[in-house]
Regions:
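Intrinsically disordered, low-complexity segments enriched in small/polar residues
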Residues: 1-4, 68
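Active-site-proximal helix/loop segments of hydrolytic enzymes
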Residues: 18-26, 34, 43, 47-149
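Short, glycine/acidic-enriched capping/hinge loops at junctions between secondary-structure elements
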Residues: 38-40
Length: 149
């Protein structure tokens, strides 16, 4: 049932109540902060992904029965290091960590969706188990939703 949440979010179906996420929590990390990763023409990845993260948090609370949504930063004035983000997510014990980035390239023909999950050196999944399975499921939906490819 939790896969339905991503389906509704990516395809933009509004006012649909997604159930089955009760007992779940999510950590949203709008990657970078402040002036990090400034693009050409003054594009700020940090500002753009913050808006996406805040909107995602609003959608999750208003259109699902998810218990808790954590977010690593809530405004452009916060400077949050990678260590602080991961430490916060690990401290609260979130079920899912979702880091949002909008990587860019000077090659306009390059469009990609990147999904990462934890894996130990011996090849076993990094707890909580399920990241690879979720990423395998999500990659096509995210790519289609962002109209990449």
């Amino acid at each position: 049932m939790r896969y339905l949440l991503y389906f509704f979010l990516i395809l933009g179906i509004h006012n649909a109540q997604v159930t089955g996420l009760n007992g779940w929590d999510l950590f949203i990390d709008p990657g970078h902060s402040q002036d990090e990763n400034m693009g050409i023409n003054g594009y700020s990845e940090a500002k753009e992904v913050l808006q996406v993260g805040l909107e995602l948090m609003d959608i999750l609370y208003s259109q699902s029965d998810i218990d808790t949504v954590y977010i690593s930063r809530t405004n452009d004035n916060q400077s949050v290091s990678l260590y602080q983000r991961t430490n916060y997510a690990n401290t609260v014990g979130a079920s899912w960590f979702h880091s949002i980035h909008s990587d860019a390239s000077s090659n306009t023909n390059t469009n990609r969706t990147l999904m990462l999950w934890g894996q130990r050196n011996n090849g076993n999944p990094d707890p909580p188990v399920g990241g690879e399975e979720m990423s395998s499921f999500m990659i096509d939906i995210l790519t289609q939703g962002m109209r990449i490819g």
